[in-house]
């Protein structure tokens, strides 16, 4: 049905989005299309209404004869339109646009967007390949009202080989498997996972011994999916796998013989080998290399001496098994000379507030904030305002030459300006980040809530950020590292890619990831405990041979 009085924010803008008019490939592009520009995906309603009613003396709107408005003539291809026909006269979308024009193109600035959406049903199972499943998208508004917005929402399949979905949320099953479905509506996002079961007649579950909670969570899903896992790998396979995963090196012939000749039960000696390798010199070297990649240790930015100092610093942290939250906090709050405090090299590498923020959120939270620098994130909840509010935490980071550098410099090319070998990182008393759209200084603010200890009025902005980011209550911090370690050891993360946590990219086993995250936090952010827990699971020790 067409609303009696269409509201631009809640009725018209969703239609414009669904028709594709404000997409990045159309009028939502940076410079618009053919002289007409809209805000990308409608994130700025005031700008869009003015574009329709004020630009070019208001030629796009005809209040006296709404059907003759260029806005409608273009969308119906009644006049030439490079974007083709987007709507037909008489259809609901057309009527909503027409009624809005007929009633004066009003914009109620107090009108609120949906605060959240939900997809119904949650995690449905399609029993037979070829069957259909209708999804509904329901929007919830701040005043407590809700309504079905399936027609206006976008629903997309993340695995089109398993299931596809049409414009009105009707899912078609293609083959056995799982397909995450992402629904988005006016900046709100929700997901569900479709399971296509297929013919599993004759399936019988065989009870298996769970080595720990990881196996219990995995078995719950195997039962639901009607899958029998592979058997355990042989001792020969296990010893090679473990050495490669924990030390990056194949075991020596002597190590293999010693393990195979040990008369102890297989399970017992496997646990002993895990405990033996976790924390040894080769283990420390291997995981130091991984962190060298993550922290971008590079002579180009630090010089040979600075790169060596930075690497030696976090090698000692890994060797001492520093809790992950403390490790991250030392980096985030680092100041002083990167010669005396090598952790400060993190800032010497990145330097600019926006680059520091993008890298920090990507590395420690597995979120991608670079997409919302120029506009609201098109496929996530992150906004352009949040980009600059987060960057503001690094706005006062500054650098000055460390006298111990003497006459040693790095860079000096046309691309890389010359900088002292060692620099002192410090926090200025002033300095702000300017918001691209508003031109005003951004006020530091977190993109989501997380309880943390600390007084906002004490310490630097980075201290406050570090307390928030490393909090046990932060939904992304521990989860992102747990998923990263799982991916390193298992070859694929519970979330893939490893550094892309978002609503439209749900974990393959949410219950397992939740338990692992909670266990990691309760262990005191002990990375070695996490690695041991994964390696001692039945899941880790399964054979590569298909059941």
Could you describe each region identified by the protein language model?
Residues 1-4, 8-95, 111-138, 146-211, ...:
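Solvent-exposed helix-loop boundary motif
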Residues 16, 22, 27-30, 101, ...:
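Protein kinase-like catalytic domain
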Residues 86-98, 311-312, 505, 509:
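Short secondary-structure subsegments characteristic of cysteine-rich extracellular domains
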Residues 95-108:
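A eukaryote-biased signal for short, well-structured alpha-helical docking elements
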Residues 106-109, 143-145, 189, 378-382:
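Inter-heme linker and motif-flanking segments adjacent to c-type heme-binding CXXCH motifs
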Residues 141, 166, 435:
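Acidic surface patches and DE-rich sequence motifs
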Residues 206-282, 287-547:
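Primarily short, surface-exposed interaction patches in extracytoplasmic proteins
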């Amino acid at each position: 049905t067409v609303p009696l009085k269409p509201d631009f924010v809640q009725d018209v803008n969703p239609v414009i989005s669904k028709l594709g008019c404000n997409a990045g490939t159309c009028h939502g592009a940076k410079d618009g299309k053919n002289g007409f520009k809209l805000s990308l995906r409608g994130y700025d309603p005031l700008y869009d209404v003015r574009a329709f009613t004020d630009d070019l003396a208001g030629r796009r709107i005809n209040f006296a004869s709404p059907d003759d408005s260029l806005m409608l003539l273009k969308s119906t291809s009644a006049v030439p339109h490079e974007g083709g026909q987007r709507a037909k006269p008489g259809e609901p979308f057309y009527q909503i646009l027409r009624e809005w024009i007929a009633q004066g193109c009003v914009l109620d600035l107090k009108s609120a967007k949906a605060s959240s959406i939900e997809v119904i049903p949650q995690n449905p199972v399609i029993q037979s390949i070829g069957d259909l499943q209708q999804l509904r998208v329901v929007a919830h508004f701040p005043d407590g009202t809700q309504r079905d917005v399936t027609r206006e929402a976008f629903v997309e399949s993340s695995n089109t080989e398993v299931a596809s979905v049409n414009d009105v949320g009707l899912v078609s099953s293609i083959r056995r498997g799982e397909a995450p479905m992402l629904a988005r509506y006016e900046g709100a996002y929700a997901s569900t996972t479709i399971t296509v079961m297929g013919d599993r007649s004759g399936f019988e579950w065989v009870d298996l011994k769970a080595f720990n909670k990881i196996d219990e969570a995995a078995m719950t899903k195997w039962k639901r999916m009607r899958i029998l896992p592979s058997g355990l790998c042989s001792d020969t396979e296990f010893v090679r796998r473990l050495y490669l995963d924990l030390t990056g090196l194949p075991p020596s012939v002597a190590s293999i013989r010693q393990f195979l000749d040990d008369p102890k039960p297989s399970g017992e000696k496997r646990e002993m080998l895990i405990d033996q390798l976790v924390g040894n010199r080769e283990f420390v070297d291997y995981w130091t290399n991984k962190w060298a990649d993550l922290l971008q240790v590079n002579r180009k930015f630090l010089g040979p001496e600075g790169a060596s100092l930075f690497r030696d610093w976090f090698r000692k942290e890994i060797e001492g098994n520093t809790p992950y939250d403390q490790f991250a906090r030392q980096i985030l709050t680092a100041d002083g000379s990167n010669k005396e405090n090598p952790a400060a090299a993190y800032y010497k590498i990145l330097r600019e507030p926006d680059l520091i923020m993008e890298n920090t959120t990507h590395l420690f939270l597995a979120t991608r904030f670079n997409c919302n620098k120029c506009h609201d994130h098109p496929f996530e909840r992150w906004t352009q305002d949040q980009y600059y509010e987060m960057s503001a935490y690094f706005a006062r980071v500054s650098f000055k030459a460390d006298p111990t550098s003497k006459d040693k410099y790095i860079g000096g090319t046309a691309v890389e300006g010359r900088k002292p070998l060692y620099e002192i990182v410090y926090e200025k008393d002033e300095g702000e980040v300017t918001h691209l759209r508003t031109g005003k200084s951004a006020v530091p603010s977190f993109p989501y809530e997380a309880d943390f200890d600390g007084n906002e009025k004490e310490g630097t902005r980075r201290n406050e950020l570090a307390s928030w980011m490393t909090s046990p209550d932060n939904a992304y911090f521990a989860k992102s590292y747990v998923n990263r370690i799982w991916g390193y050891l298992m070859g694929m993360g519970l979330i893939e890619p490893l550094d892309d946590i978002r609503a439209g990219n749900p974990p393959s086993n949410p219950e397992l990831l939740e338990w692992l995250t909670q266990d990691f936090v309760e262990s005191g952010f002990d990375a070695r405990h996490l690695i041991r827990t994964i390696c001692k699971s039945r899941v880790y020790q399964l054979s590569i041979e298909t059941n």
